């Protein structure tokens, strides 16, 4: 299990954060697939592998390792995020060899369409920065498809710095966070 401390369980009125458990796996996978379908219907290929049954981030294994966090309202799954304290093979391919010791890797941030438009995505991202503490980690890194202007704009508004593009078409962002 990963060493972390949840500093703030509440992220908004009635929404709370907690580590995912094995029993959450099916609903999390369903949320991610529905999000991939929603993205596809809007012309994006982000997360398209999920629609083919491919899960490069191994949701179930990541839950077992303590890397997946759910956000619920009245026990209903509202959002999910994966926070890796060490880079995956995917992250190493995108980011190269530098800066891994002090980085958290954020993946699979998804909000249920039922809760869309309430600023929940921004609150989950803020929670990843300040609502949970990973010892000795001073930055969050994330990637997204290069053709999503809305997502790029969102990350920049949230204070993430564009770090460049990977040869395979992914944009890289990172943000410094306070380590205690």
UniProtKB/Swiss-Prot annotation:
Residue intervals of the N-acetyltransferase domain: 31-180
EC number: 2.3.1.-
Keywords, alphabetical: Acyltransferase, Transferase
SUPFAM superfamilies registered for this protein in UniProt: Acyl-CoA N-acyltransferases (Nat) (SSF55729)
Keyword Nucleus: no
GO function terms (MF aspect): acyltransferase activity, transferring groups other than amino-acyl groups
Keyword Transferase on entry: yes
Record family assignment: Belongs to the acetyltransferase family.
Annotated PANTHER family: AMINOALKYLPHOSPHONATE N-ACETYLTRANSFERASE-RELATED (PTHR43877:SF2), AMINOALKYLPHOSPHONATE N-ACETYLTRANSFERASE-RELATED-RELATED (PTHR43877)
Protein name stated in the entry: Uncharacterized N-acetyltransferase YesJ
Lineage summary: Bacteria, Bacillati, Bacillota, Bacilli, Bacillales
